Amino acid sequence: MPILRSATSTQGRNMAGARALWRATGMKENDFGKPIIAVVNSFTQFVPGHVHLRDMGKLVAEQIEAAGGVAKEFNTIAVDDGIAMGHGGMLYSLPSRDLIADSVEYMVNAHCADAMVCISNCDKITPGMLMAAMRLNIPAVFVSGGPMEAGKTKLSNQLIKLDLVDAMMKSADKTVCDDDVDAIEKSACPTCGSCSGMFTANSMNCLTEALGLSLPGNGSMLATHADRKELFLTAGRQIVELCKRYYEQDDASVLPRSIATKAAFENAMSLDIAMGGSTNTVLHLLAAAQEAEVDFTMADIDRLSRKVPCLSKVAPNTNKYHMEDVHRAGGIMAILGELERADLLHSDTRTVLGMTIGEQIAKYDITLTKDEAVHKFFRAGPAGIRTTKAFSQDCRWDTVDDDRQNGCIRSKEFAYSQDGGLAMLTGNIALDGCIVKTAGVDESILKFTGDAIVFESQEEAVEGILGGKVRAGHVVIIRYEGPKGGPGMQEMLYPTTYLKSIGLGKECALLTDGRFSGGTSGLSIGHCSPEAASGGTIGLVRDGDKIAIDIPNRSIQLLVSDEELAVRRAEQDTKGWKPANRQREVSMALKMFGHFATSADKGAVRDKTKL
């Protein structure tokens, strides 16, 4: 029978000092011997996805205490990728993921916590906490802050839906007047919550449902809706139940590594492909799998991407639907239900509710259940009122969207495309692979051959795009922006957004060893591995080289002879694999990250051979 980890600091005469300190935090005599449960919050006033989380820890803690546990809350850092975008701050985004994972490990192990509830939301916070949960392997439940309501404004007397990307794109479009840019800016992000499209934050919060570590509705229920409160309350109660099952009944099936098995990781990746999620999820799932010691690799992703169709298109892949529409269509349980019916899901994986994922689908899929409470839950909708308050409204759609032929979520028969929403490409320029969000690529450029125009930083690429150097037919190369080369693997949302703003969104391709925001669409290929700083072929590309991209056949080739590439490689070995003229201040913290980082195909995790 497992012993409470917290007994290390709460039991025995020699722990009198530790108990004295615990008492100073408010613990009473009868609390010693109860499970101490870490409430891992990420409240910050810097990030709209986290600005409403201050009181969420208290909600969870009250339920833990009522159910017989002891709750102790701490906070992690949280970086807003949108605010950090387009300047040196973006170098810190991906490294913050690993820092969050480490800080959770430090706090939980230093204080011998028995379990944890992870209150996350935005881009690197959910992955960081997920990595920590896999690493620690103690009972854990995830509950996120929820998505933002989509923005809405009138342009040319027409009501349109908006999100962050619209504000960025229109600001760079010289044909859009200042008044319209101002109107879009003030309407794009109306409430608290993670940005309203299927960007990285929402993608990851959806994937925790597929992994079995969060509750149904976690990825799609709006941050502002009163119904979301129940997710926090249930998380607090359920974590105590998981503690009892593990520590009192010796049931290891409730532990994260028992729930998030390889089959569960395949379910999560299949969901990501089906919903056209962010390419960043590939990076984070690979990293979490390594922490879980699960053999889940790019080869598995490639295999799944060849058979899973695209069942949902949400912003930025379309302007028609946002997360509030996904929820109305039944949320993640509905997409998983369609995958199950297409025999593309492992239905026997477990969840923190003690059910299999198949049992949860049977209970929560709106096309299967007649339960009015479930239908009411998925009719929760936006209020259209600017607010930073959670649970501040109780608006509902009149009906759910259960149209699987023409609705937001489709069946396999009526899929947006039989080819999935993400694809891995390989070739001589990306021997270990690269990733493209096919759900955001126009059909006319699924095959594309063009001339390379090379930039050795994101900043240089932005100047080139806005300065007129990039023309139709170019393949824009942005290199030395990988985990090592950046260091930090910046997101390239500004270059892709600016290409669209000047009318080249369907006329150019972009290839980088960096990564893309979940808000990116177009022929944008990231995670090129090995990266330039590790001697990858992307570091050998020269202006004017032909590059052939063939998404249907999963191929990307630099059309330069092996002999010429060998000559170039010898020259580059002499020069060193670093950008020629880039001026960039890099802190010691970032240098440390870059020194230990692997390429994107390994999840940009630490290279353990260097430890």
Curated annotation (Swiss-Prot):
Keywords attached to this entry: 2Fe-2S, Amino-acid biosynthesis, Branched-chain amino acid biosynthesis, Iron, Iron-sulfur, Lyase, Magnesium, Metal-binding
Pathway: Amino-acid biosynthesis; L-isoleucine biosynthesis; L-isoleucine from 2-oxobutanoate: step 3/4; Amino-acid biosynthesis; L-valine biosynthesis; L-valine from pyruvate: step 3/4
Active site annotation, chain numbering: 517
Modified residues (N6-carboxylysine): 124
Reaction(s) the record says it catalyses: (2R)-2,3-dihydroxy-3-methylbutanoate = 3-methyl-2-oxobutanoate + H2O; (2R,3R)-2,3-dihydroxy-3-methylpentanoate = (S)-3-methyl-2-oxopentanoate + H2O
Class of enzymatic activity (EC top level): lyase
SUPFAM superfamilies linked to this entry: IlvD/EDD N-terminal domain-like, LeuD/IlvD-like
Known cofactor(s): [2Fe-2S] cluster; Mg(2+)
One GO CC term on file: cytosol
EC number: 4.2.1.9
Pfam families documented for this protein: ILV_EDD_C, ILVD_EDD_N
UniProt function note: Functions in the biosynthesis of branched-chain amino acids. Catalyzes the dehydration of (2R,3R)-2,3-dihydroxy-3-methylpentanoate (2,3-dihydroxy-3-methylvalerate) into 2-oxo-3-methylpentanoate (2-oxo-3-methylvalerate) and of (2R)-2,3-dihydroxy-3-methylbutanoate (2,3-dihydroxyisovalerate) into 2-oxo-3-methylbutanoate (2-oxoisovalerate), the penultimate precursor to L-isoleucine and L-valine, respectively.
Entry similarity comment: Belongs to the IlvD/Edd family.
Protein name per the record: Dihydroxy-acid dehydratase
Protein source organism: Actinobacillus pleuropneumoniae serotype 7 (strain AP76)
Gene (UniProt): ilvD
